[in-house]
Amino acid sequence: MPSAPDSPSLSVNVSGNVQKYSIKKKKVLNAEETELFELTQAAGVVIDQEVFKIIVDLLKMNVAPLAVFQTLKTMCAGQKVSETSTGDASSTSHTTAVPTESRVRSKMSSGQGEKSARESSSQRVPRQVSATRGQKSTKSSGSSSSSSQLTSN
């Protein structure tokens, strides 16, 4: 009988800790990141705020999106191994959730990859274009003179 009164106080303590954790968790993202996080949730992505924050921070530091994806994939692979040892039911539920997250990560990384490719190509294009323009102008003048020679022959 003494264990019954202890149970409610124990659950109150646990719920209090959960509330503290929830409050802490909400402070992880700034306003812009929170908006992005809410958009990902609206798109049907289930991801922890802290993981989302890590991904955003890495991408802000110009870490290659593919490297971020591979690191997360490796981390998830490690979780699958540990979850399998704990129980089949939990590993099954997490196994179904992980592909969704990896698809989202690949979408995010491909979107970021396109963005970084555009940025890097825009940075490279002036160098290549100037070199290409010089080659094209000599080729075009050379080809036009050769074509005029062909027509004159």
Curated annotation (Swiss-Prot):
Compositionally biased region (Polar residues): 81-99, 107-133
Principal localisation: cytoplasm
Any single Pfam family the record assigns to this protein: MOZART2
GO cellular component terms attached to this protein's record: centrosome; cytoplasm; gamma-tubulin ring complex; spindle
Coiled coil: none
Region (Disordered): 80-153
Biased composition (Low complexity): 134-153
Keyword annotations from UniProtKB, A to Z: Cytoplasm, Cytoskeleton
Location of the protein in the cell: Cytoplasm, Cytoskeleton, Microtubule organizing center, Centrosome; Cytoplasm, Cytoskeleton, Spindle
Family: Belongs to the MOZART2 family.
Quaternary organization: Part of the gamma-tubulin complex. Interacts with TUBG1.
Protein name in the entry: Mitotic-spindle organizing protein 2
